[in-house]
From Swiss-Prot:
Keyword field contains Oxidoreductase: yes
EC number from the UniProt entry: 1.-.-.-
Similarity annotation: Belongs to the Gfo/Idh/MocA family.
Enzyme class: oxidoreductase
UniProt cross-references to InterPro entries, sorted A to Z: Gfo/Idh/MocA-like_OxRdtase_N (IPR000683), Gfo/Idh/MocA_domain (IPR050984), GFO_IDH_MocA-like_dom (IPR055170), NAD(P)-bd_dom_sf (IPR036291)
Keywords: Oxidoreductase
Keyword set includes Oxidoreductase: yes
Superkingdom, natural source: Bacteria
Protein name: Uncharacterized oxidoreductase ORF334
Amino acid sequence: MDLVRFGIIGTAAIAVEKVIPSMLSAEGLEVVAIASRDLDRARAAATRFGIGRSYGSYDEILADPEIEAVYIPLPNHLHVHWAIRAAEAGKHVLCEKPLALDVEELSRLIDCRDRTGRRIQEAVMIRAHPQWDEIFDIVASGEIGEVRAIQGVFTEVNLDPKSIVNDASIGGGALYDLGVYPIAAARMVFAAEPERVFAVSDLDPVFGIDRLTSAVLLFPGGRQATLVVSTQLALRHNVEIFGTRKSISLKNPFNPTPDDHCRIVLDNGSKLAAAAAETRRVAPADQYRLQAERFSAAIRSGSPLPIELEWSLGTMKVLNAIQRSAERGNWETV
């Protein structure tokens, strides 16, 4: 199978620290070019990773006829603009999350996909990690009974005034930077969409972003998911899944490193003691590499993408409803 030739649009930290190194070790693709608005930054990244070509503008990399697909790690407010530009230039697109800032933006991207015939995917890398396949198998087996509640927590500390996460004007804040993860976890495990949400946010008085957002998501049949995301609380990543017979705790659900043995802890609820728990380990995996490989394989085979834009549209509807609820103080329909 011919390798899918990728260009990287931007030199964001997530690209240079996580995604590019993983893509370089992936099968079925090669990274042939990288672009930045600062040519020196592009050249430095190209030298660091042994990438053949570097460009000082995004337009230049889109004009490169050898590039078939692009990875976009730009700030949130630029995702849709450059994804559309890339698709119109004939490139397939793997774009960081959140894919858009609102439903209208994402609908325009879906229209662009349908018009151009290019493949466009949101980079929700957790879906590629095998620990989630193990979770789905456990839930489907009925071992934990009927799943009625899910809790997701993603907190970290980022007080950098230069960070895009702390710029409200470009889609920063805890909800848009971190909320995608626990929302994805709940939607994947329930295999359903929430109907209503209620949320509260605490705004940073200097940055103007939501530094803490909590939300309740009501799913069909009375099932519930709760989430807490923050950019100014001590680091914690956790997902709890509650069934009528057992509960599941994922100890590193979102950002396991390629050498992490992920732990899935099942508790039968018979007593509040460690003896009631069973730990299952999932072999280490590089979720960024797997994400890139599966995206590339879908391009070559013409098979469905691991995550289609319609699924991302569902995420966007939830994010927007949470934001409305936090602003208005009301339950909001998704």
